[in-house]
């Protein structure tokens, strides 16, 4: 390999590194497919596990950012928690804090924020969503630019042209399932 300043600790950690540099990878199979990415930090079993080329990601927790691997243009993501952003594939500028936050859909959108257990869990292609609170915006799967703050805020929103909604407070917006409200 020609990469510089890499640190890998754990079974299979950083095992495919070629030209990547400045990566710190700790955990079994963490960053094991990382080849050319730079400035990544991963801590936990399979954190950044299938990532190969993107850069400037931080993944802390079991399977956090585990499936990000499809695009060199993805990166600048932060995930902290059990399976946080585990299904993120080509997303960029994503922040996931909490167990399974932004962790259920194959996320390709940009600028999504999920804070809390399963916050924004099913977001797939939507961009610029903000979900803060236990299961806030949990079933949203597309579109974007929604703001859900509070436990279960906009948690049933999931189909159709469902963008530009704002809900603040416990269980706020439960009746919003589709459409712009």
Q: How would you label these PLM feature ranges?
A:
Residues 1-181:
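Glycine- and small/polar-enriched repetitive beta-structure motifs of secreted/surface proteins
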């Amino acid at each position: 390999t020609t990469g510089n300043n890499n640190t890998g600790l754990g079974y299979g950690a950083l095992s495919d590194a070629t030209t990547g540099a400045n990566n710190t990878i700790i955990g079994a199979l963490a960053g094991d497919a990382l080849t050319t990415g730079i400035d990544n930090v991963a801590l936990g079993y399979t954190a950044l596990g299938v990532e190969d080329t993107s850069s400037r990601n931080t993944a802390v927790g079991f399977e956090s950012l585990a499936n990000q691997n499809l695009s060199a243009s993805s990166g600048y993501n932060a995930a902290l928690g059990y399976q946080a952003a585990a299904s993120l594939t080509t997303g960029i500028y994503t922040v996931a804090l909490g167990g399974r936050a932004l962790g259920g859909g194959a996320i390709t959108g940009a600028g999504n924020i999920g804070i809390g257990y399963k916050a924004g869990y099913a977001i797939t292609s939507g961009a610029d969503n903000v979900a803060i609170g236990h299961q806030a915006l949990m079933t949203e799967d597309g579109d974007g630019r929604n703001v859900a703050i509070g436990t279960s805020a906009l948690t049933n929103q999931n189909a159709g042209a469902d963008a530009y909604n704002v809900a603040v407070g416990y269980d706020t917006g439960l009746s919003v399932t589709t459409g712009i409200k």
